[in-house]
C-alpha cells in the first residue's frame, strides 16, 4: 500500500515538474520574467494610487496583440429619401474578446429623377434593391472571411484584398453573360424584317445672294450632335467594396482614438501628419431651377453660394443659413402673378403658375422661374437687404447639369421651355452670363461629356475668371483610374463621389493625380444621401478645395454641415487650423492662353480649305 502511494506521489511530482518546465519555457519565450521585473520596478518608483489600473492601462494593454477584424456585417437601411442603402458594421478581437467598433453607411450611385415615368421609377427601384441586397450578401457571406484577422490599420492590404475579390466578381459576371449569350445564339432568330428605304436627304440650304448679311460660319458647318455614351456599367454589389474600405478606415481611427480625417490624411501623406489642415470651401445650394422644376427655366439645377475663403466654416454656414432664410421669406412675400393675355382653348384667360418653392432632394428650394436672370436678381436683392456685396462676401456657382438639358430629338440643349441652343450657342450664352454676372466663379457640367470641343472653347474664354468643374461629365473614380487620364475634358477640377467599388486607396490615388495636374478636388454628395457624415472627413483628410453638400434643409445633409463645424472647432483647439487661399486663376489663365493659341493656329490652318469649298459652291 505504501509503495502504491509513493509511486502515485512520484508520478504527480513528475507531472508537476513537467508542467513547471513547460510554463518556464512558455514565459521565457514571451520574455515575461524580464518584462514583469521591469514593470514592478518602475511601478514601485511611480507608486500610482490605482496599481492595477496602472498595470492594465499603461503596460499590459500595450503588450497585447493589436485588434484584428473578426466580423463584418452588412445591413440594408434607409437613406434620407426613404430608399434602401448599405450600412457596414465592423467588430474586432480585442484582448481575446470580440467587440463592436463602428458602423458606416454609403449612398447609392443612382440619380434621383423626379419627373420620370412610373415604369422607369419601378425599374430603378428594382435595380437599387438588387444592388443593395447583393452587397449585403457579399459582405455577410464572403468579405468577412477575406478580411478576418487583418489589422484595421493595414489599409493597403485591406483594399488589395477587396480589389482582388471584386475582380473575381467582375470575371464571374462576365462569364455568366457570355454563357447567357451563347445560349441565346442557339435559339433560332426570327426572319429579318425588311425596312423601307430611308428618305432622301434634305436639299442643301440656298446659296447667299450678293448683299445678304453673312451668317456665322459655325452655323453653316454645324456638326450633328453626337449620341450619348452608354452609361458606365455598375456591377450589383460593388458598393460593398467602398463601404467596407471606409468602415475599416473608421475602425482604425476609432481604435487609435483619432478622428477619421486624421487617419485618412496619414494614408495620403505616407503616415506623416500635415502641420496644418485647411478646411474645404463650402458649396451650399440655395435654389434649384433645373429640368424638374415647374417653371420654364431649366439651366440652373443648383444655384450655389460659395462663402469667401476668408470666412471660417462656422461663419460660412451662418451666412448660408441667413441667405436661405431670406430666400424663403422672399417666396412668402411675392405678389400674386399677373394673368396672361393669351387665352386657352376654352376661351378663358390662362393664369401663370404661382412662384412657389418646395424643398428638393438636394436640400434647397425648387422654384419655377422663367428667365435666367430671375434667381440671380433675387440673390442680388438679398445681398442688398443684408448689407453684403455679391462677389466679395460670397460668390456663386451654377450646376448646369448639361447632360440633363440635351434634347436629342432636336440635337440641342433646352435651357428653357421652348428655347433650344446648339453646343456652340451655349458657349456664347455662358460667356455672356459671366460677363453680366462676374460674381459667378464656377460652372458645373456646363456641357455633356461628349461635347469636348465646347469644353475647350469655354475653357479658353473663361479660365481666367470662372472655374469649369466636371461632375457627371467626369465619370467615376474607378473609371478615371482605369483610364489613367483625368484631363479628357478641359476643366479646372473634378467632383469626387465615394460610391460603389471606390476604396480609400483609390481616393488617395485620385487626389494625388488631381493635385499633380494642379486641378481642384471637389468632394460632393450624391443625389440620395444617408445620415452618415464621413464625406466631410474624406474632404478634410484628402485636402479637397471645395465640398459640395447641397442645401441646408434636409436632415441627412445637415449632419454633414454639423460634422464640418465639429472638425473646424477641433482643429482650432489643436492649433492646426490653416487659412484657405483666395481664389486664384493665374495658373489656369496661362493654360487657357496656350489653349487659345492652339485653337487660333488650327483655325488659320483650316481657312484655305474652307475658302476653296465656298468658292466651289459659288461656281
UniProtKB/Swiss-Prot annotation:
SMART domains: Enolase_C, Enolase_N. Pathway: Carbohydrate degradation; glycolysis; pyruvate from D-glyceraldehyde 3-phosphate: step 4/5. Disruption phenotype: Male mice are infertile and the sperm have significantly reduced motility, ATP levels, and enolase enzymatic activity as well as a structurally abnormal sperm fibrous sheath. It is an enzyme of class 4 (lyase). Residues 173-184 have a biased composition (Basic and acidic residues). Testis-specific. Expressed in spermatids and ependyma (at protein level). Residues 188-206 have a biased composition (Pro residues). Required for sperm motility, function and male fertility. May be involved in the normal assembly of the sperm fibrous sheath and provides most of the enolase activity in sperm. This is Enolase 4. The lineage of its organism: Eukaryota, Metazoa, Chordata, Craniata, Vertebrata.
Amino acid at each position: 500500500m505504501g509503495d502504491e502511494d509513493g509511486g502515485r506521489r512520484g508520478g504527480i511530482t513528475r507531472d508537476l515538474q513537467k508542467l513547471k518546465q513547460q510554463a518556464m519555457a512558455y514565459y521565457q519565450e514571451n520574455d515575461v520574467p524580464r518584462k514583469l521585473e521591469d514593470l514592478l520596478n518602475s511601478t514601485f518608483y511611480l507608486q500610482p494610487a490605482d496599481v492595477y489600473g496602472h498595470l492594465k492601462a499603461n503596460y499590459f494593454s500595450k503588450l497585447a496583440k493589436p485588434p484584428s477584424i473578426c466580423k463584418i456585417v452588412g445591413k440594408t437601411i434607409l437613406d434620407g429619401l426613404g430608399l434602401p442603402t448599405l450600412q457596414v458594421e465592423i467588430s474586432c478581437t480585442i484582448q481575446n474578446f470580440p467587440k463592436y467598433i463602428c458602423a458606416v453607411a454609403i449612398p447609392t450611385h443612382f440619380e434621383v429623377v423626379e419627373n420620370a415615368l412610373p415604369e422607369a421609377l419601378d425599374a430603378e427601384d428594382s435595380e437599387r434593391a438588387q444592388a443593395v441586397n447583393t452587397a449585403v450578401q457579399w459582405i455577410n457571406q464572403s468579405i468577412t472571411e477575406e478580411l478576418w484577422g487583418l489589422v484595421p490599420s493595414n489599409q493597403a492590404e485591406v483594399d488589395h484584398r477587396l480589389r482582388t475579390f471584386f475582380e473575381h466578381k467582375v470575371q464571374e459576371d462576365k462569364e455568366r453573360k457570355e454563357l447567357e449569350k451563347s445560349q441565346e445564339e442557339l435559339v433560332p432568330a426570327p426572319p429579318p424584317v425588311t425596312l423601307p428605304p430611308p428618305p432622301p436627304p434634305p436639299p442643301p440650304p440656298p446659296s447667299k445672294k450678293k448683299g445678304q448679311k453673312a451668317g456665322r460660319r459655325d452655323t453653316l458647318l454645324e456638326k450633328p450632335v453626337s449620341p450619348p455614351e452608354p452609361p458606365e456599367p455598375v456591377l450589383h454589389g460593388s458598393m460593398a467594396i467602398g463601404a467596407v474600405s471606409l468602415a475599416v478606415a473608421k475602425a482604425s481611427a476609432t481604435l487609435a482614438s483619432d478622428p477619421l480625417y486624421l487617419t485618412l490624411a496619414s494614408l495620403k501623406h505616407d503616415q506623416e501628419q500635415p502641420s496644418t489642415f485647411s478646411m474645404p470651401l463650402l458649396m451650399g445650394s440655395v435654389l434649384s431651377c433645373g429640368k424638374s422644376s415647374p417653371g420654364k427655366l431649366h439651366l440652373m439645377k443648383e444655384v450655389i453660394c460659395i462663402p469667401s475663403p476668408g470666412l471660417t466654416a462656422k461663419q460660412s454656414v451662418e451666412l448660408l443659413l441667413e441667405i436661405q432664410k431670406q430666400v424663403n421669406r422672399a417666396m412668402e412675400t411675392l405678389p400674386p402673378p399677373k394673368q396672361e393675355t393669351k387665352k386657352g382653348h376654352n376661351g378663358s384667360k390662362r393664369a401663370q403658375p404661382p412662384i412657389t418653392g418646395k424643398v428638393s432632394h438636394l436640400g434647397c428650394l425648387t422654384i419655377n422661374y422663367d428667365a435666367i436672370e430671375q434667381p440671380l436678381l433675387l440673390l442680388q436683392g438679398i445681398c442688398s437687404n443684408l448689407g453684403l456685396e455679391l462677389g466679395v462676401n460670397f460668390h456663386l456657382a451654377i450646376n448646369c447639369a448639361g447632360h440633363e438639358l440635351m434634347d436629342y430629338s432636336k440635337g440641342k440643349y433646352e435651357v428653357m421651355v421652348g428655347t433650344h441652343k446648339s453646343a456652340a450657342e451655349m458657349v456664347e450664352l455662358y460667356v455672356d452670363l459671366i460677363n453680366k454676372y462676374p460674381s459667378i466663379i464656377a460652372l458645373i457640367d456646363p456641357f455633356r461629356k461628349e461635347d469636348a470641343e465646347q469644353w475647350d472653347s469655354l475653357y479658353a474664354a473663361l479660365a481666367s475668371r470662372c472655374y469649369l468643374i466636371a461632375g457627371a461629365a467626369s465619370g467615376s473614380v474607378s473609371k478615371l483610374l482605369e483610364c489613367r487620364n483625368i484631363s479628357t475634358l478641359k476643366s479646372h477640377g473634378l467632383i469626387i463621389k465615394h460610391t460603389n467599388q471606390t476604396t480609400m486607396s483609390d481616393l488617395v490615388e485620385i487626389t494625388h493625380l488631381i493635385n499633380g495636374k494642379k486641378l481642384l478636388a471637389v468632394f460632393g454628395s450624391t443625389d440620395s444621401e444617408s445620415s452618415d457624415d464621413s464625406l466631410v472627413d474624406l474632404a478634410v483628410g484628402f485636402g479637397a478645395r471645395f465640398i459640395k453638400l447641397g442645401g441646408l434643409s434636409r436632415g441627412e445633409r445637415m449632419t454633414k454641415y454639423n460634422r464640418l463645424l465639429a472638425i473646424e472647432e477641433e482643429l482650432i483647439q489643436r492649433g492646426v487650423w490653416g487659412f484657405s487661399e483666395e481664389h486664384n486663376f493665374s495658373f489656369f489663365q496661362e493654360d487657357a492662353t496656350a489653349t487659345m493659341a492652339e485653337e487660333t493656329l488650327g483655325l488659320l490652318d483650316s481657312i484655305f480649305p474652307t475658302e476653296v469649298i465656298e468658292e466651289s459652291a459659288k461656281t
